């Protein structure tokens, strides 16, 4: 009996590595030392930072992965994986430096895995983050046929003096919300239930002319390059930032707000995108549940001083980023620190 007889095909793994090498190399930065295949991936941090603070993050894509597998859409789910990780470390002002992925399946399909890793490499390239390593695990009997799991890991760096930790947030600061590309990678257990119960055809078109399934599978927006540019040019105006993920607007922005302060969010400041309107209507989802489950069209939030908010908004306009002034920091209302209305 051989390892292949037991369900592990080493040759398929080697074929995958050869397929993805050119894709991965496109994401490399000058600091990357060596290529793929080593026991450890190397990154030279010596040249750019004086007092670097390393910021790490890890995440998956939730059950959006289940929907991607059902639809056979493997080429963009890797972008979601990168976005969930790099947008998180960006919150503290960090530039994502490198990324590693974990791909696990019962039987390795080289074409599927190459499509997934290609998306990861593309997400890294768009974020200026090097895909320097990963693990492909073929584990017979662990997963149903055709299914796989994903996890991502990133490390970023920020100068210690420029670290954003929320300490500068003040009463009266303004919340500037930057548009999301859709649900990103959160709320998909609810989304899948609504989608199944609604019985909507695959070709169902939303009010804006987008196919429903395209809106649901739109890759997570990558905020790294535009936000790092803002930090470089207008860093003094930004007191904190938030990535709107699981927990929605209700639970994410407040994570970077000091005790004693709260948030007033004006839900009329922007229009709920059609995909979220469809989900709320078809799922009979209450407003409060929408706010604490989905990003509702706001994927990233900048918290800025009132005096400099207009300048920051002009800089966002210059980058063609859709944005809205969605609220402000206020004294906390007892135990109720977040009000949306």
Curated annotation (Swiss-Prot):
Q: Which reaction does it catalyse?
A: 2-formamido-N(1)-(5-O-phospho-beta-D-ribosyl)acetamidine + ATP = 5-amino-1-(5-phospho-beta-D-ribosyl)imidazole + ADP + phosphate + H(+)
Location(s), subcellular: Cytoplasm
Q: Which domain of life is it from?
A: Bacteria
Report the principal subcellular site: cytoplasm
The record's disulfide annotation reads none
Enzyme class name? ligase
Protein name, as recorded: Phosphoribosylformylglycinamidine cyclo-ligase
Q: Which organism is it from?
A: Xanthomonas euvesicatoria pv. vesicatoria (strain 85-10)
Q: What is the lineage of its organism?
A: Bacteria, Pseudomonadati, Pseudomonadota, Gammaproteobacteria, Lysobacterales
Q: Which gene encodes it?
A: purM
């Amino acid at each position: 009996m051989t390892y292949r007889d037991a369900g592990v095909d080493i040759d398929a793994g080697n074929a995958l590595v050869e397929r993805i090498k050119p894709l991965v190399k496109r994401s490399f930065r000058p600091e990357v030392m060596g290529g793929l295949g080593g026991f450890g991936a190397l990154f030279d941090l010596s040249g750019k930072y004086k007092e670097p603070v390393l910021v790490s993050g890890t995440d998956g894509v939730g059950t959006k992965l289940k929907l991607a597998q059902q639809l056979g859409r493997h080429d963009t789910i890797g972008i979601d994986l990168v976005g969930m990780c790099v947008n998180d470390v960006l919150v503290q002002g960090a530039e994502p430096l490198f990324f590693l992925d974990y791909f696990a399946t019962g039987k390795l399909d080289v074409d599927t895995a190459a499509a997934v890793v290609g998306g990861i490499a593309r997400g890294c390239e768009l974020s200026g983050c090097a895909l320097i390593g990963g693990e492909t695990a073929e584990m017979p009997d662990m997963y149903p046929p055709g299914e796989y799991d994903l996890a991502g890991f990133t490390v970023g760096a920020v100068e210690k003096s420029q670290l954003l930790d929320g300490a500068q947030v003040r009463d009266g600061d303004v919340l500037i919300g930057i548009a999301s590309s859709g649900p990103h990678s959160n709320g998909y257990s609810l989304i899948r239930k609504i989608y199944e119960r609604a019985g909507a055809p695959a070709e169902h078109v939303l009010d804006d002319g987008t196919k429903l399934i395209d809106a649901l599978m739109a890759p997570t927006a990558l905020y790294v390059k535009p936000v790092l540019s803002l930090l470089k040019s207008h860093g003094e105006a930004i007191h904190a930032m938030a990535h709107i993920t699981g927990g929605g607007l209700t639970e994410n922005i407040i994570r970077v707000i000091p005790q004693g302060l709260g948030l007033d969010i004006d839900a009329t400041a922007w229009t709920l995108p059609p995909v979220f309107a469809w989900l709320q209507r078809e799922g009979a989802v209450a407003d409060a549940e929408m706010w604490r489950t989905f990003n509702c069209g706001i994927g990233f939030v900048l918290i800025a001083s009132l005096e400099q908010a207009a300048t920051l908004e002009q800089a966002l306009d210059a980058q063609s980023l859709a944005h809205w002034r969605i609220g402000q920091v206020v004294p906390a209302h007892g135990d109720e620190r977040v009000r949306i209305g």
